[in-house]
Amino acid sequence: MAKKKKTLPANFYELIEAKDLDALKAVFNECELNAYDRHSFKKPALSFYDVPLELMDWLIAQGADINVKDEYDRTPLYYHAQVNNVEKVALLLEKGADIESKAAYDETPLFGAGYHPEVTALLIAKGADVKAKNDMKHTPMEAMLHTVQSIDISKAAKTAELYLKAGLKPTKFAKEQITRIGEDFEFHREKFNPEYLEETDAGLQQLYKLFNVPPVPRRIQHDGQSSIILTGDTWEKRYMQAWDSLVPSNGSAATVQGEVVRIAGRINLELLRNAMGNWDREYRKMLNAISG
C-alpha cells in the first residue's frame, strides 16, 4: 500500500470553496488525516477557517488528531476561537479538544479568542482557565485589552465583563490599557465612523466603569484662528499640549504651527520606534523644513 502524503494538495482551498464534501473526503485517500498546507505554517485541514463542519466531524471520526498543531503549536481549537466560530469550537470541545493546549508564547485557546465575547463565553463555560498566563505573564483578559483598537471597544467591553464575572480582578496593567484605549479613541473621535460612534462610546464608558478608571477627557482642538497658548512648565508638556490641540487624527494640520508639531512627531517616531529603518530623502526634507 502506497504511503500517504503529509501535505495537502495545492487546490485544497478551491475544494473547500466548492463545498464538495465527497471531493474533500477523497483527498484523504492519498493524504494523511493530519496532512497540512505546506505554504501556511503547516496548518492541518482541521484548522482551515472555512473547513466544513461536516468534514471536521468526519476527519475526527476517521482518527485525525483533534489537537494537531501547526508550526506555532496552534491547535484547531485555537484557530477557530480566533475567528469567533462558536459552532466549530463547540464541536471540537464536544469531541475532546484540549482546552488548555499551549501555542507559541504560552497562549491557550482563550488567548486566541481575543475580544470575541461569544466564543470567550463558551470557553469559560467549558472550564477554560481565565487565570492562565502567557510568556508575558498576562492573563487572557490583559492580553486582550493590550491589543484592542477603537473599532473593537464594544466587543471588548462585553468580553472584559465576562472575565471579571469569572473571577479576574482589574489589575494595574489592565487599567493602564483602558486608559490607552480611551486616549486612542478620543484622539480619533472626530473622524471616527459615525455609524459605530454611539455603540463604541457606550462600550468605552462601560470599560471605564468596569475597571474604575477615570474617563479620558475629550480632545479640545484649536479652531485654526485663536491665539495658541501653551501652559506646560516643561517643553515636553507644551509639546503634548500642542499635539493634542493642533494635530488632527490623520492628514495635514490646519495651521503652520500644527504642521510643524505633526512633522516633528513623525520624525520622532521614525527615530525612536523604527530606528530610522524607513529614513530616506523625504524624511530629510521634512527635517530641513522644520529646522529653518
Language-model regions: role of each:
Residues 106, 115-121, 132-292:
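Ankyrin repeat (ANK) tandem arrays and their immediately adjacent linkers/low-complexity segments
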Residues 10-20:
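Alpha-helical segment of the N-proximal tetratricopeptide repeat
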Residues 53, 61-64, 69-86:
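A broadly used, surface-exposed interaction patch
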Residues 19, 51, 84, 115-117:
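Ankyrin-repeat intra-repeat helix-capping/turn positions
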Residues 26-33, 57-65, 90-98, 121-129, ...:
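Ankyrin repeat domain, specifically the short helix-to-loop turn at the C-terminus of the second helix
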Residues 5-12, 35-50, 69-76, 102-111, ...:
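Ankyrin-repeat boundary/"N-cap" motif
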